[in-house]
Amino acid sequence: MKILLSCLSFREFTGSELYFYELSSAFQKAGHDVSLYSPFVDLPLKDKTSGITFPSRDDIDKESYDLLIFSHGSVTWNYIKNVNAKKIINVVHSEVLDLEQPIQSEKIDLYVGIRPSIVNYIVDKIGSSNKPVKLIYNPFDTSRFNPQRGKKKKSIKDKIVLFPGSLDYLRYQPLKYLLDLSEKQNFKVLHVGRNDYTTVHPNFTTQEPVWEVEQYYKQCDIVSGIFLGRTSIEGLLCGKKVLQFDVDKEGKIKKVYWHQ
């Protein structure tokens, strides 16, 4: 099949960008002809791809595809709405970001939510539309994320909560919650990813985003994240308990609970 993928950005080791990396890699390994269109393609993520082409906007309007899969429709739909594709799938990664609102168009054949709460969100948004909505979780490389590779190093004695992901307004209140709790329960919080805030706390350490993020799963006892997203599932795959936060669109905490 000739497949076009489209997302807002393809450059960082984070969330939906890694989703499209995993998806494009899986399609390419299965023998498909895979292209990815994004207005923002750059290192370091682009360097991790192999056999994937990155066409321009003019190029995609001239081609015909068997399948088009896209996200971040509030922006990307304007670029791809005239693409000639036999089947179009809108994948939604968030129920709180305006960027991720499902596109309501007769051209869409299928909607996909990456967790149950997003499926409910899509159904509410598209209303009486008869288009199908499916739950398909994030794709993962289980050779990287598994209990054996995630086993904590015996040399690390501190109790550590790993808090991966971009530290933006959606994760700021959960971080404060963890740091307050760390003072009562004596643990360290290790953040890995982009950091939009200056946070100074004796129990807090932050690291730059890295490709080999699994090395940090070997250092922790517990993984924490927002929603049932990439970091939560990576933690579960590595055999960790996961403390999950659900937040609203302003980043206020709605619910705190365990997965294990």
Name each region found by the language model.
Residues 230-260:
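Catalytic binding pocket for nucleotide-activated donors in carbohydrate/polymer assembly enzymes
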Residues 142-144, 150-200:
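Conserved catalytic-core segment of nucleotide-activated headgroup transferases in glycan assembly
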Residues 70-75, 92, 227-228:
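Short His-centered aromatic/hydrophobic patch
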Residues 55, 194-197, 203-216, 228-230:
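Conserved active-site histidine-acidic residue motif and adjacent donor-binding/catalytic loop
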Residues 7-19, 168-173:
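A short, glycine/small-residue-rich beta-strand->loop->alpha-helix junction that serves as a flexible
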Residues 16-27, 175-179:
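Short amphipathic alpha-helix
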Residues 63, 209-220, 233, 237:
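Short acidic alpha-helix that forms the nucleotide-activated donor recognition element
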Residues 117, 139:
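Carbohydrate-associated surface elements
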